[in-house]
């Protein structure tokens, strides 16, 4: 695969997306605006975090992963339409939970989690800039 010249990279290119979001202040500002929440402090954003809890299970690689004191966030860039996006989101969220909760720990220690997909295309076709879904227990 031929690499694009750096001058042609945009925010949606994996390399550029990672470099921009690696800046904790930019990442924090993006999350606060997107989720309409206040974040006091985030730990350093981790790029391409891999989670593979079992040899035979399907592992994941999170584009940008970060935490604050009681929440975890995953920000993904999606450059093409993927009909499996809803189930992929569900799987990513469950894998993040598995990664957070060690053996012997209480379920109350699970943090609130957010999985955000930034899509170049309108996945649902309603011409909206943002779609929000909540899983509740």
Report the location of each language-model feature.
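Elongated, amphipathic alpha-helical interaction scaffolds
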Residues: 1-137
